[in-house]
């Protein structure tokens, strides 16, 4: 297998979370599952391999939703932990479900490619090993840890802890300027119509854009 590399880029924790919930929202609704989350982080902007981070949680959430019966719940909690390295942050993400759970025997091999849970026919598990082996590879590559707590019939909790570089707000400015394909000198003094329905995002964007000499008018959406 080819050597995997980290492609570090700018991301916001809430954007990544929102993106994942958009992917699984319909599926959860169809199964009448409660999909909920809590976020408690001091630093919102990060530099990391956002594609691999998303892939980790796509696999975990996909299994959580797949193996949780109608009327159950999947909860995601995201917390920032103290980090001993300057300029970095630790983010712990827990995904807990009320699903069918896993046997202790299966748990010990969960991250080996192509392992499958055979113990229960009602679970109809088709084989989640490949997804989990990728998850483990990506977590290792990003210098993180993953552990699983589970009991048959009582659901599972996956805990992933990853270290990300903290991005300062200049990355946010750069992103806005790159998206508008122009330099801040050209923008200075211009009026900007900011279409953003999230109050926190809007507040951050307004502060940054005003600092770059722009006049801001905000609307809730682009319609």
Question: Where are the model-predicted features located?
Answer:
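Conserved catalytic submotifs in the C-terminal HATPase_c
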Residues: 7-12, 29, 34-44, 81
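Short helix-loop "hinge" at the ATP-lid/N-box region of the Bergerat-fold HATPase_c
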Residues: 64-65
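Cytosolic transmitter module of two-component histidine kinases
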Residues: 32, 177-223
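Glycine-rich G1-box
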Residues: 26, 100-101
